[in-house]
Amino acid sequence: MAITRLGRKDFEKLLEFRVTLRRFQRWSEDQARMAGLTHVQHQLLVAIKGHRGDVPPTVGDLAGYLLLRPHSAVELVDRAQDAGLVERTPDGEDGRVTRVRLTAEGDRIMQELTQSHLERLHELAAVLDELVNSSGGTAPDR
């Protein structure tokens, strides 16, 4: 792959992209706080609710999603369980495995937060599309 000399517009786009992401992250953290969650608890609930498959995730699954060490994920799940947001349940097929699922309260909070996040992401999609597809930069198309 040949290296292309990047122009000023490329760096301006990159900066705008990073600022846009950071603003979304800050907004998301504020939304979580207003819902009574820490931003890390919100990420945990997203990981549980967004887990693919027919069974809830394990703590190991959650550690992978959140890029945490397993013992850190255990502590996070402990705190969320103490807050009434999640519950642990034994796996139906392997008694050594514990799964984590949302409580009714955790699910209610996730429904509210996800609705506002999806609305915000639709707004950001147009901004990001413009950044990626606008002319003036020198970076090659993919």
Give a label for each model feature:
Residues 78-136:
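Charged, amphipathic alpha-helical coiled-coil/dimerization segments
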Residues 26-69:
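N-terminal helix-turn-helix DNA-binding core of bacterial DNA-binding proteins
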Residues 59, 77-78:
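Short, hydrophobic-biased segments on the C-terminal half of alpha helices
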Residues 18-21, 66, 110, 114:
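Amphipathic, non-transmembrane alpha-helical scaffold segments
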Residues 16, 43-47, 108:
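Pre-recognition alpha-helix immediately N-terminal to the DNA-recognition helix
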Residues 54, 132-142:
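Short, charged, intrinsically disordered terminal tails
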Residues 1-35, 83-85, 138-142:
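N-terminal leader segment of winged-helix/HTH proteins
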